[in-house]
Amino acid sequence: MKKIGLASDHAGFELKEYVKTWLKAKNYPFEDFGTYSTDSCDYPDFAHPLALAVEAGECYPGIAICGSGEGISMTLNKHQGIRAALCWMPEIAHLARQHNDANVLVMPGRFIDNEMADKIMNEFFSTDFDTCEVNFTL
């Protein structure tokens, strides 16, 4: 398995630290692109390096967290090769992987707890892209 890339801003830092514990327990390698504290910061400073690493194939998938998840999602999705999906419940994570081939999971740090993050990550990591979604003709 490739390294999983992680990024957050200050509002997502605590959940990101929990995600690191979750990944370690499952023996998933990861790279943390920051932030490294709860000090106020700008999410693009950490979203762009994560997006570049996923685009380059250095990390797959990515996990990004900010307060609402919206800002970091918008920044990530400015990158051509990124399909970041904001997921606040497992069903959305499932559909994001199955139908949209999401390569970055985004979670809202201010609106979900660790238990919900567990469920979302389990669903995201256990769902494959359904390739029939791309096998159609117009």
Which residues does each PLM region occupy?
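Short active-site oxyanion
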Residues: 3-4, 59-62, 81-83
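C-terminal binding/interaction regions
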Residues: 5-7, 11-12, 90-138
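Glycine-rich phosphate/diphosphate-binding loop of Rossmann-like nucleotide-binding domains
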Residues: 6-25
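A short beta-strand-loop structural module common to alpha/beta enzyme folds
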Residues: 29-40
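Short, structured active-site "lid" loops
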Residues: 46-64, 68
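Mid-chain, well-packed structural core segment of small domains
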Residues: 64-110
